Amino acid sequence: MNPVFVIGHRNPDTDSICSAICYAELKHRMTGEPYIPCRAGHVNTETKFVLERFGVQAPRYIKSFEPCLSDVQYRRIPGIDEEMSLHRAWNYMNENDIQTLAVVDEDRHLKGLLTLGDIARFYIEDQDANALAEAKTSYRNLVDVLDGTLEVGDIDQRFEQGSVVVAAANPDVLEDYIGKNDMVILGNRYESQLCAIEMSAGCMVIGLGSKVSRTIRKLASENGVSIIATPYDTYTCVKVIGQAVPVRHVMRKKRLITFEPEETVEDVKRTVSKKRIRYYPLMDEQGRYVGMFSQRNLCLLYTSDA
């Protein structure tokens, strides 16, 4: 059973306050159900003295019985860090069956929103050979999406310059194809690996689970070339590597629509009815993210008896 609020008249005097307290307690003892004493105004001096004299807490103050967002059953989906990869964000959405994620800082302040549409738009419209560098993608994310290991380099560094290049040609052709700081995806051909180092590539992604020779590791380290070893073939590497981009590069940062618990459901409905957005972030009184709600949650709002 939902709680029943027991309340007196507005601008309550001592009789109104005490009656609500006593009747709520009586009904609770008779039925065992939750009855909550409430008040529709502030406690005056006389009533405050009586309550303190008998050690009774003042009833809950209710400004209005019009449903607010605090009455809505929202989704308590934790926010994500802006450095999370699109790969992990996508999996997080699927695991929680939600199409929108809040991107927050360590204090749960909202930094942006990420939707399935944003991810799809990035893959169709925005992703190109320079996307990883433009997003300043971390090597930690790259190793994660490639299910690989960092053979040479610093896991906390970022790939900030260069394009993604597939070394599908002979070394003599690659010399004109690989640019400085590029990320080169290749196989186990020693000559191609050596060529990438000589052309000052920024990173080599060596696929098919190929073992990286000691000589290549030494030369790469001396020339500042990172090496990621992965069990994936070239096609799979090309397919998944863009998923390493951090969500901050794709998320929406401007004109975010947020709501607070004390806003009335009717006011919220009027606002969201004009938007083509499925989920909205709910913020607490301190402006910290607490969860997501949808128009469906508003329609399923339960009402308490009074």
Predicted feature locations:
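A glycine-rich helix N-cap at a beta->alpha junction
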Residues: 50-71
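Short, ordered loop/turn segments at secondary-structure junctions
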Residues: 10, 40-42, 63, 106, ...
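Non-catalytic interface/targeting segments
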Residues: 109-183, 251-279, 288
